[in-house]
Design a protein with these regions (language model features):
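Short hydrophobic beta-strand element within catalytic cores of glycosyltransferases
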Residues: 300-304
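A structural motif in glycosyltransferase catalytic domains
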Residues: 22, 29, 204, 219-222, ...
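A conserved, positively charged/aromatic
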Residues: 131-157
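Glycosyltransferase donor-sugar binding loop
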Residues: 39-46, 207, 232-245, 261
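A conserved mid-protein helix/loop that constitutes part of the nucleotide-sugar donor-binding site
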Residues: 16-24, 202, 211-225, 245
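Aromatic "clamp/platform" in nucleotide-sugar-dependent glycosyltransferases that forms part
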Residues: 264, 283
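Short glycine/serine-rich donor-binding loops of glycosyltransferases
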Residues: 288-291
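Donor nucleotide-sugar binding/catalytic pocket of nucleotide-sugar-dependent glycosyltransferases
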Residues: 63, 154-191
């Protein structure tokens, strides 16, 4: 009999590694014969329409739920509306997820971020197994969830964390249970070889969203110290406006040359050549999807040990 798995999405978009990774996992599970459902917060933005289309093409059933705030009260994202509206929204979301579980005879609920709790509660109410996939260190903007550890422990049949330092951290947070680890799931097909560049121009490249946690400003400072004549530093990916401004200000203040930002690309790896070196200087990140993709594409890669 076909098993049905319900995933709870953090954002319902394809602009972050956690979502891309688990979309790849959901597609894989569909190919293995599972029935896969997905619930996401529906904010009626174009990027979510693209998300739905991508999932539906893969045979994944999607449910967009209206939400005042989807993440925990204390999680990043501010405090939209007021406390009363947020509590009512949380309650409605839990009820809606319970209905989805019952109507579809769901066998397993998986929350794809520590930042959402609705699926955990709904699964408990309906006596269905619940797994938690955690991508975030309990530090900085996600430090709030240290206060949620008892809840997470109580409402998880199993806890999975991104392999490496995060798994080690969570083993200390949950000393009485096993923490399983996973590497980000990728659908990339390893290439015979990256694009060959006819000249000898070398570049340092960094793929991924420009954010404080990913720490690209530190790479810009290192590039300045290296002072390599003729070498370019290229960033491929969208950005947080405030952090991009910090980077722009530093570049202008120090009159740095040969630094460029190419923005979001559907296939950033198609822009990489055999003369490039990939560098990922994250200060507070897990073992990310871009690391896996970089290695699978045969790119020499340097990444921070954080």
């Amino acid at each position: 009999m076909t098993k049905t798995i319900l995933f709870i999405s953090p954002t319902g978009t394809l602009d972050n590694g956690a979502e891309i990774s688990i979309v790849n996992l959901m597609k894989f599970l569909v190919k293995k014969g599972y029935r896969v459902l997905n619930v996401f917060p529906d904010y009626k933005v174009p990027s979510q329409e693209e998300y739905q289309v991508e999932l539906q093409k893969a045979g994944i059933e999607t449910y967009g739920l209206s939400a005042v705030k989807w993440w925990w009260e204390e999680a990043p994202g501010g405090s939209p509306g007021n406390h009363f509206l947020r509590v009512n929204s949380y309650n409605k979301n839990v009820k809606d997820i319970r209905n989805i579980i019952v109507d579809n005879k769901v066998d397993l609920v998986i929350s794809n971020t520590v930042n959402v709790f609705q699926g955990a509660l709904a699964a408990a109410f309906e006596d269905v197994k619940h797994f938690w996939l955690i991508h975030e260190f309990p530090e900085g903007e996600f430090g709030y969830y240290k206060e949620k550890l008892d809840f997470i422990d109580t409402f998880s049949d199993e806890i999975f964390a991104v392999t490496g330092a995060l798994t080690e951290d969570l083993e200390k947070c949950f000393p009485n249970r096993k923490i399983y680890s996973f590497a980000p799931y990728t659908q990339i097909e390893p290439k015979e070889g990256v694009k060959t560049e006819s000249n000898d121009q070398h570049r340092i490249v960094s793929v991924g969203r420009l954010t404080q946690r990913k720490n690209q400003l530190e790479l810009i400072k290192a590039f300045q110290m290296l002072d390599l004549a003729g070498t370019e530093l290229v960033f491929l990916g969208a950005w947080d406006e405030d952090y991009k401004q910090l980077c722009d200000d530093y570049i202008a203040e120090h009159d740095l040359k040969n630094v460029s930002f190419l923005g979001y690309l559907d296939d950033p790896w198609s822009e990489i050549t055999d003369k490039d070196l990939a560098v990922f200087p994250s200060s507070m990140e897990t073992f990310g999807l871009v690391y896996v993709e970089s290695v699978l594409n045969g790119i020499p890669t340097i990444l921070s040990d954080n």
